[in-house]
Amino acid sequence: AFFIRRSLKGLPLYTTVLNEYLYSILVRNTPLEYFLEGGRSRTGRLLRPKTGMLAMTVHSKLRGGGKPAVFIPTYFGYERLMEGATYVGEMSGKPKEAESIFGLIQAARKIERIFGKVHVNFGEPVFLDDVLKAHNADHIRLNSNEQPLPPEAVNTVNAVAQNIMQNINRAAIINPVSLLSLVLLSTPKHALDEDVCIKQLDAYRRLATNAPYDERVDVTPLAGKEIIAYGLKLKLIKRVKHVLGDIIAIEDNQG
């Protein structure tokens, strides 16, 4: 792992050194991991890809750096985020809070809470050589770090980024919290009769299983009643007693 600046604008020497360092890594055929979105999505939807590191990777490969490059799109899905409430505040217009010792102490206290699982799935690999050929860029050879990417190679970078993001989306995991969110957040008061909630959870799970978005999409095996029990365990939802039947509602202050 290595750390880099968030922005390279106006830093030609830094950019040159980073390019050369990346080239030296790829020449040795060392696996490299980076996140095209540049950060974690606040909404669950994919962010627009940031292609800086990807462009450097393609540049290094066009200089003859190591074996053919293969990108493995990787999906990460969280059932519950430690920063959930903070994200809701940011989406409501509140300014992003600066990191502090007090914030670190608050985060440490949250460790005792149950946050569920982190789901990981792998999408269909993207082969750089195939995309280069599709954009008539497979003949390009760069001799030095200072040579800019020609238009065909720039188009290749954008195409690779798009393919990676699409393949991440096709490898999504529909977990219990995803289904609970779909059912409860679509109601006016974020609450629903428990029996109706169970039926809707089962219906959406059957739909996702029988008509999948992609063969790589994975759907939770839990039935509706089990999904509610799981949500109660994570303290994401609550059961409100009622003479006409219990109500399932989202817990207060949930992100």
Kindly label every feature range from the protein language model.
Residues 1-255:
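Membrane-interfacial terminal anchoring regions of lipid-handling membrane enzymes
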